[in-house]
Each structure stands twice: as C-alpha cells, then as structure tokens.
C-alpha cells in the first residue's frame, strides 16, 4: 500500500506540474507589489556612519598632517595595499615622505583605521569613484590628504554619531 501511495504522489506531482505552479504563483504574487528598485544615479540609499568607502588622511586643526609614520597600518593591512616611506625631521619627529594605497589591492576592511594611534587614516562614505587611466588606482599622500580635507566635517559628524559604539 505504501508503494502505491508513493506512485500516486509521484504522478500527481509530475502531471500537475506542482513545482511549476508554485513558481508561477510566486511570480504573480510579487508582480503586483510595489517595486523596490532604486534608480541608482538619481536616487541614493542612506549610508551608515560606519560605512567603509574611500580612504583619506586627516590633518590636525593647525594644518599639520596627523600621520606619525609608525607604519602600523602598513603592517596590519592583509592585502599589502599600503606603502609608507618616512624620514626624520629636524625636531626629531618622523613624518611620511611617501604614503601610497593601491586601490586595486585594498579590500576596504578598515583594519588600517583601527590600528592608527592618532586617527590619521580614516574611511569615508565616498563609494562612487572610478578609474579611467592607468595609475589612478594608486592613491598618493596628496590625494589622500585632499580627500580628508574635503570630507573633514562629515568625518567628524560620523565619528560623533558613532562614538558610543566604539
């Protein structure tokens, strides 16, 4: 009897195409609902203050760059995307002469930001950037500082909003 029942169920599923009808029902159900597609260039979805986008270097309020060339970000980077060269200043402090980030290698993990003792390198909410020529994938120190100067007010606001979670 059990074998006959199994055959009956098999033939009902096969000839009535229950899987196909279930798929069609799902399609019909979603066909008449409101669309949730975002038209990307014209519409923007809200970003979290913790969003990890393009990297930037920050400055102190007096205009001096924050990076002290400790090279912790270079050491902690799992993708080996950061290259730092430094030299001693006359006053005995170290400063960077070269700070490059290869954006093809960068995986936007945020470990460089977490390891920085002076909050020099930060991630910004910028997520639309493109590369149209060879060599533009290397973010030099000047480019990183320019992005940091451009985004400083928003970075401060995002850090203030996120402070209780740090």
Swiss-Prot record:
Q: Per its database record, what is this protein's job?
A: NDH-1 shuttles electrons from NADH, via FMN and iron-sulfur (Fe-S) centers, to quinones in the respiratory chain. The immediate electron acceptor for the enzyme in this species is believed to be ubiquinone. Couples the redox reaction to proton translocation (for every two electrons transferred, four hydrogen ions are translocated across the cytoplasmic membrane), and thus conserves the redox energy in a proton gradient.
Task: Give this protein's Gene Ontology molecular function annotations.
Answer: 4 iron, 4 sulfur cluster binding; iron ion binding; NADH:ubiquinone reductase (non-electrogenic) activity; quinone binding
The cofactor note from the UniProt entry for this protein is: Binds 2 [4Fe-4S] clusters per subunit.
Biological classification of the source:
Bacteria, Pseudomonadati, Pseudomonadota, Gammaproteobacteria, Legionellales
Concerning PANTHER family, the annotation shows:
NADH DEHYDROGENASE [UBIQUINONE] IRON-SULFUR PROTEIN 8, MITOCHONDRIAL (PTHR10849:SF20), NADH DEHYDROGENASE UBIQUINONE IRON-SULFUR PROTEIN 8, MITOCHONDRIAL (PTHR10849)
Q: Where does [4Fe-4S] cluster 2 bind?
A: 77, 106, 109, 112
> Looking at its record, which EC class is this enzyme?
translocase
Q: Which InterPro entries does the UniProt record give?
A: 4Fe4S_Fe-S-bd, 4Fe4S_Fe_S_CS, NADH_quinone_OxRdtase_chainI
Q: What is this protein called?
A: NADH-quinone oxidoreductase subunit I
Which cofactors are reported in the record for this sequence?
[4Fe-4S] cluster
Cell compartment(s), UniProt? Cell inner membrane
Q: Which domain of life is it from?
A: Bacteria
A GO cellular component annotated for this chain's UniProt record is: plasma membrane
Q: Which Pfam families match?
A: Fer4_7
Q: Which SUPFAM superfamilies match?
A: alpha-helical ferredoxin
Describe its partners and assembly state.
NDH-1 is composed of 14 different subunits. Subunits NuoA, H, J, K, L, M, N constitute the membrane sector of the complex.
Instruction: Locate the residues binding [4Fe-4S] cluster 1.
Output: 67, 70, 73, 116
């Amino acid at each position: 009897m059990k074998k006959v029942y199994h055959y009956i169920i098999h033939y009902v599923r096969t000839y009535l195409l229950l899987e196909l009808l279930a798929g069609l029902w799902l399609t019909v159900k979603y066909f008449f609902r409101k669309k949730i597609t975002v038209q990307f260039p014209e519409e923007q979805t809200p970003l979290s203050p913790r969003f990890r986008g393009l990297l930037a270097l920050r400055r102190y309020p007096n205009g001096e760059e924050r990076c002290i060339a400790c090279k912790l970000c270079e050491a902690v980077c799992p993708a080996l995307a950061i290259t730092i060269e430094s030299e001693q200043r006359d006053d005995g402090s170290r400063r960077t002469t070269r700070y490059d980030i290869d954006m093809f290698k960068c995986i936007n993990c945020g470990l460089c930001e977490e390891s920085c003792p002076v909050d020099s390198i930060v991630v910004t909410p910028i997520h639309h950037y493109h590369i149209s020529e060879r060599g533009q994938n290397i973010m030099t120190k000047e480019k990183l500082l320019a992005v940091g100067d451009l985004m400083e007010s928003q970075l401060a606001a995002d850090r203030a909003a996120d402070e209780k979670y740090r």
